[in-house]
């Protein structure tokens, strides 16, 4: 699926995620805009899962607990599939920003 087709589904994913946050959480959340990433499609023989993602513009990729990480652009990569990565961060409780419960990244695979 190309970038245009994936981005057309952004509003559907956004609406679903906002509904989920309103319906199933009791805390206030800052919901960040979704962005497209290319996730590695691992073969069974792969011992390690290489992260086939677009280059982040800051110190770490979005699969870490660094809430400031995000992508500058996307690119196609043959063994990878496009996914929309949605980030939301709990803004009420005061604990370390790198705490896993304050950073949730959910990939949505458009190839299925």
Swiss-Prot record:
Cystine crosslinks: none
InterPro entries hit by this protein: DUF468
Classification via Pfam families: DUF468
Annotated region (Disordered), positions in chain: 93-112
Coiled coil ranges: none
General remark: Contained within a telomeric X element core sequence.
Protein family according to the UniProt entry: Belongs to the UPF0320 family.
Protein's UniProt name: Putative UPF0320 protein YEL074W
Annotated organism of origin: Saccharomyces cerevisiae (strain ATCC 204508 / S288c)
Taxonomic lineage from the root: Eukaryota, Fungi, Dikarya, Ascomycota, Saccharomycotina
